Structures are given as C-alpha cells and as structure tokens.
Amino acid sequence: MSHKPDDDYDYLFKVVLIGDSGVGKSNLLSRFTRNEFSLESKSTIGVEFATRSIQVDGKTIKAQIWDTAGQERYRAITSAYYRGAVGALLVYDITKSVTFENVERWLKELRDHADSNIVIMLVGNKSDLKHLRDVQTEVAQAFCEREGLSFIETSALESTNVEKAFQQILTEIYHIVSKKVLDSEDNRPKIGEGRDVIVIDNAHDDGGKKKGGCCS
C-alpha cells in the first residue's frame, strides 16, 4: 500500500489550540500528531506547531496544529497566531472550574482576532479524572449551544476522543471549504458571499488548496 509523501495533500488547514495554561493543549497536540503523552509537559518558548494528514471524503487534508506554547500565561498571544486559522480547539480542564470560567474570555479574544467564520470546538480535557470533576458536562454543553460551538470531552492521557475531536473539526472545515469552492464555481459573481464562507488567506482566497499557498 503506497502512502502519499508529506508534502502531497489537497488542502492545508491551520487549527489553533487555545485555553488556559496547564489544561493539556500540548499533550492533545502530541497525542494527535505523534501519539505521545508526557506527564512532565513543560511550556515551550515561542510558538510550536505540528502536522498530520488525514483522509476526508477521499481527499488528503493536512492539518497544521498550532500550540500557544506558554504565551497564554502572559496574555501575549498575538493576532499573528490566529491569522489564517480556519479552526480552533478551545480547551479547558474538567477538574478546574476556573479554566472553564475563562473560556468566555478566550472565545472573545478568538472572535476579535480570527476570521468570523472560524470553526470552533470546546474541548473538556482530562476526562480520565472523573473523580475530580469540577465542571459538569451539561453546563459545558449548554454553553456551547448558546454560543454555537461543537463540544467534546477528551483525555490526552488515555487517548480518549482525541482522534475524534480533530477528525470532527477537520471534517467540518473541509465541508465548509469544499462547499465554498463549489459555490464559487457555480456562481462566480457571488464569490465571498454567504454565511459559511471561510477566508483562508486574503491574498490567496482559493478555499485552502495547496496551489494557493500555505494558509498560515
């Protein structure tokens, strides 16, 4: 069985991880891209990203997952971090209610700096620590319904729902972007119109296809 080389893909999607420090963003990244988990995760200086390709509807989707790498401690995340992002995983720790309370602030920052049509998923991480749960699932679900977000609970430690979370958000992005491409081909004068349009890159607005350039 032949595998496509890493640079052979149909779409490149930038997805950002945001949320309070210590909620498990780096481990979600490493679990999805390398199937690794570290109990001694240390904040990285600068911005870290990793990539992984998946198949959606017969297309190769290369996900470029960005991690804040500790910047959130200083509230120093810049607009450059969000630029070009078509998806965001907003992560909190189910055992620490303060990390859930801060979700609203993160959501506001995301909506202030990112494209208005970015796909957002709320992720309640550390579901393996059910005995220490401080945020009820129903409360988080109600928040997501109110804000129009998708929702999932994960455990990077046990690898529970990590794959599902990334597959779900990347599939949703793909369906929106591919619909945009079809719409623009069917009705060229209306390019850029419609509620579900995601602008991948203002200079190369081509639905995120590789030949239009990287979308970061």
UniProtKB/Swiss-Prot annotation:
It is found in: Cell membrane. InterPro entries: P-loop_NTPase (IPR027417), Rab_GTPases_membrane_traffic (IPR050209), Small_GTP-bd (IPR005225), Small_GTPase (IPR001806). GO terms for cellular component: plasma membrane. PROSITE patterns: RAB. One of its GO terms (molecular function) is GTPase activity. Pfam families: Ras. A lipid is attached at residues 214-215 (S-geranylgeranyl cysteine). It is a lipid-anchor. The keyword Nucleotide-binding applies. Belongs to the small GTPase superfamily. Rab family. NCBIfam families: small_GTP. This is Ras-related protein YPTC6. It comes from Chlamydomonas reinhardtii.
